[in-house]
Amino acid sequence: MHLKILYRGSLISCNYGCEYCPFAKRQQTAAELNLDKQQLQRFVDWITQHPQHQFSILFTPWGEALIHKHYQQALAQLTQMPHVNKVAIQTNLSCNLDWVEDCNKDTLALWATFHPEWVSRQTYVSQCLELDKRKVRFSAGVVGFPQYKNEIAALRQELPSHVYLWINAVKKELPNLSPEDKSFFSSIDPLYHLNIHHYPSFGRSCRAGESVISVDGEGTMRRCHFIKEPIGNIYHQNWQEVLQER
């Protein structure tokens, strides 16, 4: 079996303070971070204990994970496992990058978001170039607010041409975008048009819950982050039995 997992632990803190983010500049206690660390290690151990399956794992933390060493170590461990096909993580790229040398770079990938209100373009591009130099796969991206168009245009010019630069469309802002705004974002991201629609998925079957699941720090399985109803727990013996088309 090849199972794709979206992992989101109990981390809910970030070193950036973006106004649209509920976890902006939020801090956690040492005890809370230690709980997240323990949960993450349990998850890594669980992956280790199931070599008969293939896994692809995407970390989508509520906050910035890579400023914490336990996430760096977890990615290094997971990427070295032969039954793990890919390990990717969402990040603002504010961490030191030396840890990537402990990873299998054929398996590692970073989803790196530029926050022009919190970091200079020069600093962000420098981090991207460092990743490129270290031969780490990554994509760069920006939330699609029109006020940052000049920064986004400059970013595209300064990044290597082979680096994909995506625009994360803000659905609730789409009615306020001018045709020129949409044209600009499409010129930066050739896949932008796919991100500006609400797709009619309600009530339709999909692979979520069958070959793709989300997992939280306690091991609770859900079809995805957007469907809150639990379907099982990876730490229970019958976890495979709940995987089915829905």
What are the roles of these predicted feature ranges?
Residues P175-R246:
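Accessory C-terminal segments flanking Radical SAM cores
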Residues L58, A88-I89, S139-G141, Y164-A169, ...:
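A structural signal for short, well-ordered beta-strand segments and their strand-loop junctions
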Residues E101-W111, R156-G203:
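Structural recognition of alpha->loop->beta junctions
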